[in-house]
Amino acid sequence: MVDLKAKPFYLDDEAIQWVENTIAGMTLDEKVGQLFVLMRRARTEDDIKNVLADYHQGGLRYQGGDSKAVHWQNTTYQANSKLPLLIAVNCDNGGDGAMSDGTFIATAAEAAAAPDTQTAYNIGLVAGREASATGANWMFNPCCDIYMNWRNTIVNTRSFGDNADTVIKNITAFIDGVHQSPMACCCKHFPGDGVEERDQHLVLGVNDLSAGDWEASFGRMYRTMIDGGLESMMIGHIAAPALSRKLRPGIRDEEIMPATLAPELLTDLLRQDMGFNGVIITDASHMAGIACMEKRSVAVPKAIASGCDMFLFANDADEDFAYMKKGVEDGVITPERLSDALHRILGLKAHLGLHKRQAAGTLVPPEEALSAVGCAEHRALAEKAAEECITLVKDTQKNLPIDPARQKRARLVFIQSTPTSKAYKGDPVRDVVVEELERAGFTVSVAPNFHDLEVEKGPSMENMMTMMDCGKMEEFRASYDVVFLVLNIKGYAQENNVRLRWSCNHSSELPWYATEVPTVGISLNYTNHLIDVPQVRTFVNAYGNTRTSIRTAIEKICGKSEFCGTASDTVFCGKWDTRL
């Protein structure tokens, strides 16, 4: 039986009665539907009505759209749902995770470089304000992973640090910021990512710490969040073999499952030992870390039977709903397990006051609330974060400051993620970099890029020959005073590790020029690029590819303000030459 008066619900008798009455009045289909958080592309009100009638979902996690479109969507969903919906958002960096016009404040890695936890608080504050203005009420954040392995790129920018103490301080501040708005938080990805280099989107993730080391790091962090009243926990498709073996002596290797399907991790450890009473939700169910471990018909009900309360997304909603319902009818999900899940789901809704707000017609704020999105106050917080966090990783050749009055002629070598679509027309971030360098007083010559040449001139061997041609060294030195190597590399769920990739083989983009003229490397995202360009002796982590981040980084490089961010040793990737 779930204690709804205890943390994190703190319900009074009236709210508990609403939970009990609601469950008592549900059909089996409605109970099954509450277990799902779905993402459906519903374009009209009729589409939304049909989705709700078919699946009776407990929650919504949407993807994309500007603030007005998201506000309309959330308003329409809530207006047509029998029960108030949990509407979830991913806001790792601020309000930009909730809508396309939201405010980017900083990445978690950027916040970890700050002198205090104020940046982490501001990320949560702005994320909560802007997301709640659209009607969202559930923050799928903070990311509580610990960045222990520099090769791990899936949490490189999303982790608040490489040790438990730094992460605990920052995620506590983030949650405090979010809680200034009517939103619940969700720590992810239990039992913890960042230990190995692989990505649970693509393979079974493995946290291979010993039980003792896990308890001293991830365990201590999760216990701190639970003690603080954390409302929900997202479970990663990540195995913890040492913990499973400790809790299930004799378990065979082939029986070790991701935490989403491991009752010893969810029920024995998280619920009973750690005392977590809040909602437990799976990570996205299309990820390989779960999808490749069991047949879909088994995995869907097994996740709930193992201890999850909610199931995130569906492969085919009709099919997954049928799998879940059959799991209930066949007893895979026991009546007690289903009851506990429903009590926690509805308990979270009551904790947020959604039942009262539904009755009052205030589940979604009026459209005027969208004035908070991208407001001057939030833009100022983004500028503050950039000013306090952008980090000079190294300047061993004492190239800084770069003075555009004396070193005016700049060569820009811009490296971007490899295009994945025929619709590619160039990276707009490069244009921003050029504009900001020119604003600072530089004249800018942009180095060729193979992908752009292929678009502009059509596929040709001449394009490769152009890219391989470095020209005469004497002419290069006579033409340029400084080179800016700017890296705008991002990746998601296509490869386990995302590394710097030059636009073609034997490319003239390679940093041979670092020995010819002063060269400054700037990363606009990942913090571990020195593994691929150790020969660049001046390197800056700017953390973001927004105009604010780019402008502030350039101003610091030019000596207009001091670098205030602090890098951890993970930026050097365990190599001696990256420090040179």
Model region roles, listed by residue range:
Residues Q34-E45, A108-N122, V203-S217, M287-E294:
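Active-site mouth loops of central-metabolism enzymes
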